[in-house]
From Swiss-Prot:
It catalyses: (4R,5S)-dethiobiotin + (sulfur carrier)-SH + 2 reduced [2Fe-2S]-[ferredoxin] + 2 S-adenosyl-L-methionine = (sulfur carrier)-H + biotin + 2 5'-deoxyadenosine + 2 L-methionine + 2 oxidized [2Fe-2S]-[ferredoxin]. Its EC number is 2.8.1.6. PANTHER family: BIOTIN SYNTHASE, BIOTIN SYNTHASE, MITOCHONDRIAL. It comes from Escherichia coli O157:H7. Belongs to the radical SAM superfamily. Biotin synthase family. Binds 1 [4Fe-4S] cluster. The cluster is coordinated with 3 cysteines and an exchangeable S-adenosyl-L-methionine. One of its GO terms (biological process) is biotin biosynthetic process. Pathway: Cofactor biosynthesis; biotin biosynthesis; biotin from 7,8-diaminononanoate: step 2/2. GO terms for molecular function: 2 iron, 2 sulfur cluster binding; 4 iron, 4 sulfur cluster binding; biotin synthase activity; iron ion binding. This is Biotin synthase. Homodimer. InterPro entries: Aldolase_TIM, BATS_dom, Biotin_synth/BioAB, Biotin_synthase, Elp3/MiaA/NifB-like_rSAM, rSAM.
Length: 346
């Protein structure tokens, strides 16, 4: 494997300080070297277990510590999840992400999670989960079930992290990413813009991600969605150009990673989203629901794609791509359901 130089904080800071149009030009050049600039990967996220999370993440309406009006729900039945995955595939998604509001999954739930992964894979979709902290054995079980991606965000820089979360250390997050990688699962990890962090903190976040032994295959960049009842509900709005800069720097630093427009896209007008795609974003969560916050409606996404000449990327799951794939092919029931979130994001 060719040696990959490590980034320094001063190098990343210099990128953030570049004139915006110069930065966008560089990011677009990098993007075109590694991706078809007209292709956008489309994912759908389903909250398979909502609310009552014991963590204290100050941005999150799912924390049991804040009164946000969110009604807690138990882990969904496997067939309910698979019904949602079918609809997601029919709507054009190629990756189905399942998120649970936990500090970590309980052993009693692992068999259900494995069945969910196996069922999603059998449909020809990529499977992704975000379940909190994992043990080595849990990561391996999910890998054996066929899980393609595991999402576990770093959220912000190590220096600012303690201002946002105290119930889980930064090192615990890094340890989970290492366990996921060691199990053979692709890593999805990014952060949030708008927590009250400085530009240096944004640089520090991207530095951590890019300097991992292997950078994440997927890097979600979220804009804070301010939810009444959370400690960050009154934070200042994020300047659109600052967000676009973050996308561009992420693209330059991690040229082969998918950079995803995630939470907060509902707050962006078409022009801002277009500039994010120009800056190198090439993945979105699609549809009407972003876990517990709104996301642009599907038809609006498709209209924007048409205006910009973008196309949803075809599924990356190929025959034989996963050792479990042939074993996972099985007849699946296809009842209709309305209990489904056709979009997403962490």
């Amino acid at each position: 494997m060719a040696h990959r130089p490590r980034w320094t904080l001063s190098q990343v800071t210099e990128l953030f300080e570049k004139p915006l149009l110069d930065l966008l030009f560089e990011a677009q050049q990098v993007h075109r070297q590694h991706f078809d600039p007209r292709q956008v990967q489309v994912s759908t996220l389903l909250s398979i277990k909502t609310g009552a999370c014991p963590e204290d993440c100050k941005y999150c309406p799912q924390s049991s510590r804040y009164k946000t009006g969110l009604e807690a729900e138990r882990l969904m039945e496997v067939e309910q999840v698979l019904e949602s995955a079918r609809k997601a595939k029919a709507a054009g998604s190629t990756r189905f992400c399942m998120g649970a509001a936990w500090k970590n999954p309980h052993e009693r739930d692992m068999s259900y999670l494995e069945q969910m992964v196996q069922g999603v894979k059998a449909m020809g979709l990529e499977a992704c989960m975000t379940l909190g902290t994992l043990s080595e054995s849990q990561a391996q079980r999910l890998a054996n079930a066929g899980l393609d991606y595991y999402n576990h965000n770093l959220d912000t820089s190590p220096e600012f992290y303690g201002n946002i979360i105290t119930t889980r250390t930064y090192q615990e997050r890094l340890d989970t990413l290492e366990k996921v990688r060691d199990a053979g699962i692709k890593v999805c990890s990014g952060g949030i813009v708008g927590l009250g962090e400085t530009v240096k903190d944004r640089a520090g976040l991207l530095l951590q991600l890019a300097n991992l032994p292997t950078p994440p295959e997927s890097v979600p960049i979220n804009m804070l969605v301010k939810v009444k009842g959370t400690p960050l509900a009154d934070n200042d709005d994020v300047d659109a150009f600052d967000f676009i800069r973050t996308i561009a720097v992420a693209r330059i630093m991690m040229p082969t990673s998918y950079v995803r427009l995630s939470a907060g896209r509902e707050q962006m007008n078409e022009q801002t989203q277009a500039m994010c795609f120009m800056a190198g974003a090439n993945s979105i969560f699609y549809g009407c629901k972003l876990l517990t916050t709104p996301n642009p409606e599907e038809d609006k996404d498709l209209q924007l794609f048409r205006k910009l000449g973008l196309n949803p990327q075809q599924t990356a799951v190929l025959a034989g791509d996963n050792e479990q794939q042939q074993r996972l092919e099985q007849a699946l029931m296809t009842p209709d359901t309305d209990e489904y979130y056709n979009a997403a994001a962490l």
